[in-house]
Amino acid sequence: MLYQDEKGPVAAKTHGGPSWCSVQTKIEKAQKIKGLLNVFGVYDHTNDQMYTHSYKNKKGDQFLDFIKRIDRKYGSSVKQIFLVLDNASIHRSKKVREIIQKHHHRINFVFLPTRSPELNLIEVRWLWMQRQAVNNSTFRNESDIGKAISDWTYNYNEKHGRRITDILQIGVMSMTT
């Protein structure tokens, strides 16, 4: 079971950071946005891994491209993929439904109730990513954002993948002794 969601747009802008001033002084700093990026992601709770891909837009065509990537990623090793997602219009469009039924018949959508993001396990990971990779960071352009998110995803998977491996090794060792 995979938990899917989109994050964004994430803006490439300069964060001024903290500054000191008297209480009544107002600091105005114009921030120029140098680009926007939308991130599509899935969280696989069976192995505690994330997969993300960035796009300039957040529309049905990008969602379908992301679904194709997920389908290829899991290959023939998985017979059925259950994708838990929210009720965004890009998930429910007629075009998306037709293409999924025609070309990706092993992918099944499981829609969450309206206004219930807490049921989507990827939401917590988005919060972690926002805090660790995006907040208080300076990005020159979209590729900087994409690299920061890609690096965060890689580091998340390395850290959590190792943890799962360690748990499995401990389980095997305890069974043999």
Predicted regions and their residues:
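Mobile genetic element proteins and their domesticated derivatives, centered on retroelements
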Residues: Y3-D5, V42, D48, I67, ...
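C-terminal anion-handling pockets and recognition modules
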Residues: I122-T177
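Short, basic/hydrophobic alpha-helical segments
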Residues: Q62-F82
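Conserved nucleotide-binding/hydrolysis micro-motifs of P-loop NTPases
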Residues: K7-P9, T46, S89-I90, S116-E118
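Extended, low-complexity cationic-aromatic segments
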Residues: M1-K68, Q169, T176-T177
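RNase H-like polynucleotidyl transferase catalytic core
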Residues: K26-K32, Q101-L121, S137-F139
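Acidic/histidine-rich, metal-coordinating catalytic segments
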Residues: V78-H91, N120
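Short aromatic-enriched loop/helix-cap "lid" or pocket-rim segments at secondary-structure transitions
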Residues: K13-G17, K95-R97, L121-V124
